């Protein structure tokens, strides 16, 4: 990971698509968030354990980083626990976080809906309007 810390210091957006492995678990932790710019945005579409859960929550809550787009969660609802939250920490309540469920491309129909919904929601976001299809809104 030569140069990784330098990239974190300079990047507006940091995208992780990493799998969970012994070498990647907790790679993004408090030390890495300390390196990131105050307006930097973390985007995680890989696996949640690559980012230290509590450290991410604290960095976002304290506005240490600008925000996060999170497509992978630390917990998922199950038949035994249908109300399970995406994290042990109320990340979904923070105003600098957008969370999406990591379940895209399940069918042709869902792919088509996504191609319609994503641009519509980007337009709504730009206009300051409420987003469609919000899974958790504030006090979940």
Residue map of PLM features:
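Rossmann-like dinucleotide-binding domain for NAD(H)/NADP(H)
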Residues: 39, 46-140
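Adenosine-nucleotide cofactor-binding segment
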Residues: 1-27
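Alpha-helical segments flanking ligand/cofactor-binding loops in enzyme cores
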Residues: 5, 34, 54-58
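Structural motif corresponding to alpha-helix initiation and N-cap regions
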Residues: 1-4, 30, 53, 84-85
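Rossmann-fold NAD(P) dinucleotide-binding segment
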Residues: 23-42
């Amino acid at each position: 990971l030569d140069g990784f810390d330098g990239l974190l210091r300079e990047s507006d957006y940091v995208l992780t698509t990493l799998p969970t492995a012994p070498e990647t678990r907790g790679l993004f932790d408090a030390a890495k968030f300390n390196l990131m710019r105050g307006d930097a945005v973390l985007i995680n579409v890989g696996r949640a354990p690559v980012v230290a859960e509590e450290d991410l929550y604290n960095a976002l809550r304290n506005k240490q980083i600008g925000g996060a787009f999170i497509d992978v969660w630390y917990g998922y609802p199950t038949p035994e626990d249908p109300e399970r939250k995406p994290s042990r920490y109320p990340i979904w309540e923070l105003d600098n976080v957008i969370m999406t469920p990591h379940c895209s491309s399940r069918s042709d129909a869902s792919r088509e809906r996504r191609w319609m919904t994503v641009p519509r929601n980007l337009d709504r976001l730009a206009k300051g309007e409420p987003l469609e299809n919000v899974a958790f809104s504030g006090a979940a």
